[in-house]
């Protein structure tokens, strides 16, 4: 187990912080992809410019 000198102000070790960051970024990319698909589908259905 890591000692307290390896912890940042969040209480996570560097490895834990990197893992959390990768999971967060995966979720962000998934959210952005769903948002883009939803906007494209809405634009195809009912264009808002034109």
UniProtKB/Swiss-Prot annotation:
Domain of life of the source: Bacteria
Gene designation: pufB
Keyword Transmembrane: yes
Segments on the Periplasmic side according to the record's topology features: 46-50
GO BP terms, alphabetized: photosynthesis, light reaction
Listed transmembrane segments: 23-45
Segments on the Cytoplasmic side according to the record's topology features: 2-22
Keywords annotated in UniProt: Antenna complex, Bacteriochlorophyll, Cell inner membrane, Cell membrane, Chlorophyll, Chromophore, Light-harvesting polypeptide, Magnesium, Membrane, Metal-binding, Transmembrane, Transmembrane helix
Membrane topology per record: Single-pass type II membrane protein
Role noted for this protein: Antenna complexes are light-harvesting systems, which transfer the excitation energy to the reaction centers.
Subcellular location(s) per record: Cell inner membrane
Name of this chain's protein: Light-harvesting protein B-870 beta chain
Cellular component, GO annotation: plasma membrane; plasma membrane light-harvesting complex
Subunit structure: The core complex is formed by different alpha and beta chains, binding bacteriochlorophyll molecules, and arranged most probably in tetrameric structures disposed around the reaction center. The non-pigmented gamma chains may constitute additional components.
Keyword Metal-binding: yes
Family stated for the protein in its record: Belongs to the antenna complex beta subunit family.
Binding sites annotated in the UniProt record for a bacteriochlorophyll: 21, 39
SUPFAM superfamilies from the UniProt entry: Light-harvesting complex subunits
């Amino acid at each position: 187990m890591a000692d307290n000198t390896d912890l940042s102000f969040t209480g996570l070790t560097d490895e834990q912080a990197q893992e959390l960051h990768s999971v967060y970024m995966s979720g962000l990319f998934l959210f952005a992809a769903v948002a883009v698909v939803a906007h494209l589908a809405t634009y195809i259905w009912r264009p808002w410019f034109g």
